[in-house]
């Protein structure tokens, strides 16, 4: 059985992992959001499979719904916010898929990497 890893914004679970990729399911609760972040060593593809929300990429917000897809490039700033029903996405990471490859620029849960702003 695949276990959910709780986060302040909801949860995720790893569906499959290989040497250079990782497939996850993420659920972001209504009106919650992940940190505004980027990754130095991986890309991500997101597919909305349930609910709705807002995707932010490089400061541009886009409403999203079931069936919408998004590509997150290396060092591209991004965030997802759950809509009134929350949002579930499938995320395919490619590259170095370690959890510590997250540089947080803004975070509602006090997990910001203060040195990160010097990068931009």
Task: Put a short name on every predicted segment.
Residues 59-77:
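Short acidic-glycine-tyrosine-enriched beta hairpin
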Residues 24, 45, 88-91:
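Polar/charged side chains located within well-ordered beta-strands of beta-rich proteins
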Residues 32, 41-42, 60, 76, ...:
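A generic "binding-loop/recognition-motif" signal
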